[in-house]
A protein has these predicted regions:
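Feature of Fe-S/electron-transfer and energy-metabolism proteins
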Residues: 1-266
Length: 266
C-alpha cells in the first residue's frame, strides 16, 4: 500500500503536514509520499491510497479522525462506513476526468521533490531530444507551428519573442521566468512551481537553448516560500543529474539557473 498526502500550500493550510507527520510516526503498513495540488483545494486535506494497483482518493481528512482513518486503511476496510464517507464523490471525479491538462499534467500526481518521479513520468525527455536532434532555429519553428502564446491579455506569440532574443546582438544572453503574480488571489505560477518544479526547469532550458542563453533566472514572489524551497531543491537535483550546468546531457550546451526572490509587497 502507498499513501500519498497532498502537500501544496492549500493542503498544508488545511492540515496536510500534520497528517503526514502522523502517518510517518504511526504507520508501518504502507509506503508514504507527498504530492502537490491537484486543483481541488476545497476538498483538502486530500489523501490518495494505492492498493494493488487501484487508487482511491479521500477528501477532507481531518486530523481528529486520523487514528480511525489509519486503522481502517491498515485493515483495508475500503467498503466500510468511514472510508466510504471520505472517498472522492463521483461529481468531483467527473470534474477532474473531463480536464485535459498540459502544464498541470503532473500536478497532484507526482512527488514534486523527487526528480526520479519526474523522469519516470517522461521528464527531461523533451530536453534530451531537443539537444540531440534539433537546432535552435528548429526549436523556434516548432514553437511557431504549435501556436504557443503568452497567457497575458496580449497573447503574445512565444516564438516571436524567442526569435527576437536569439537574433539580438550580444554574447551574453539570459532567460528570465517571471513568477511574480500581483493580482489578488492569483497563484497559477505558484501552483506549477510547488507541484512540478522540474517541468519549469525543463521548459526554461529548452527556451535558453533556443535563444542562446547560458544563464536562466526565476523571479519568484517572496510570499511563495514553499515554491522557493521546492524549486531550490529541484535545481540542485537537476545539477546533480547533469540536466543543469556544463555540457548538459553531453550536448555541448551549458546553462546555469538561479532563483531571485522578490522583496515582498504590501
Amino acid at each position: 500500500m502507498k499513501i500519498i498526502i497532498g502537500e501544496g500550500s492549500c493542503g498544508i493550510a488545511a492540515g496536510a503536514a500534520k497528517i503526514y507527520d502522523y502517518f510517518a510516526k504511526h504507520t508501518k503498513f504502507a509506503e508514504l509520499s507527498i504530492t502537490g495540488c491537484i486543483g481541488m483545494c476545497y476538498l483538502e486535506p486530500i489523501v490518495d491510497v494505492i492498493e494493488e494497483g487501484k487508487k482511491r482518493t479521500y477528501c477532507k481528512v481531518g486530523t481528529d479522525i486520523l487514528p480511525e482513518f489509519s486503522k481502517a486503511l491498515e485493515q483495508k476496510e475500503f467498503d466500510g462506513t468511514l472510508l466510504k464517507s471520505l472517498e472522492l464523490k463521483e461529481e468531483d471525479r467527473a470534474f477532474l476526468e473531463k480536464q485535459t491538462r498540459i502544464a498541470l499534467r503532473n500536478c497532484g500526481i507526482i512527488n514534486p521533490e523527487s526528480i526520479e518521479d519526474y523522469i519516470e513520468a517522461g521528464g527531461y525527455q523533451a530536453l534530451e531530444r531537443v539537444l540531440r536532434e534539433m537546432t535552435p532555429e528548429q526549436v523556434i519553428e516548432t514553437i511557431k507551428i504549435s501556436g504557443l502564446a503568452g497567457r497575458g491579455g496580449a497573447g503574445f506569440p512565444t516564438w516571436f519573442k524567442w526569435n527576437a532574443a536569439r537574433q539580438s546582438p550580444g554574447d551574453q544572453k539570459y532567460l528570465i521566468c517571471n513568477a511574480d503574480e500581483g493580482d489578488p488571489g492569483a497563484f497559477m505560477d505558484r501552483a506549477v512551481i510547488e507541484s512540478d518544479p522540474h517541468n519549469l526547469i525543463e521548459g526554461m532550458l529548452i527556451g535558453a537553448y533556443a535563444i542562446g542563453a547560458c544563464e536562466a533566472v526565476v523571479y519568484v514572489r517572496a510570499e511563495y516560500p514553499l515554491a522557493i524551497v521546492r524549486l531550490t531543491k529541484a535545481i540542485r537535483q537537476a545539477e546533480e543529474r547533469g540536466y543543469l550546468g556544463e555540457n548538459i546531457a553531453g550536448s555541448g550546451f551549458s546553462c546555469k539557473m538561479r532563483i531571485k526572490a522578490g522583496a515582498g509587497a504590501f
